[in-house]
Amino acid sequence: MKVRASVKKMCRNCKIVKREGVVRVLCSDPKHKQRQG
């Protein structure tokens, strides 16, 4: 899980999801998981 100021899709499988006010990127590739912080 990477914590970044700006989260971006890194591939076409990435999905941007907002959970409890936190923007996250979910993907089939675990290296692409991100959270806005």
Swiss-Prot record:
Give GO terms: molecular function aspect only: structural constituent of ribosome
* Gene Ontology BP annotations: translation
Q: Write the record's keywords in alphabetical order, separated by commas.
A: Ribonucleoprotein, Ribosomal protein
Which Cys pairs does UniProt list as disulfide-bonded? none
Q: Which GO terms describe its cellular component?
A: cytoplasm; ribonucleoprotein complex; ribosome
Pfam families registered for this protein in UniProt: Ribosomal_L36
Q: Does the keyword Ribosomal protein apply?
A: yes
Q: Organism's domain of life? A: Bacteria
The record's PANTHER family line, in alphabetical order, gives:
50S RIBOSOMAL PROTEIN L36, CHLOROPLASTIC (PTHR42888), LARGE RIBOSOMAL SUBUNIT PROTEIN BL36C (PTHR42888:SF1)
The family line of this record is:
Belongs to the bacterial ribosomal protein bL36 family.
Kindly give the HAMAP family that the UniProt entry links to this protein: Ribosomal_bL36
User: What name goes with this protein?
Assistant: Large ribosomal subunit protein bL36
What organism does this protein naturally occur in?
Answer: Haemophilus influenzae (strain ATCC 51907 / DSM 11121 / KW20 / Rd)
The record lists the lineage as: Bacteria, Pseudomonadati, Pseudomonadota, Gammaproteobacteria, Pasteurellales
Q: Which gene encodes it?
A: rpmJ
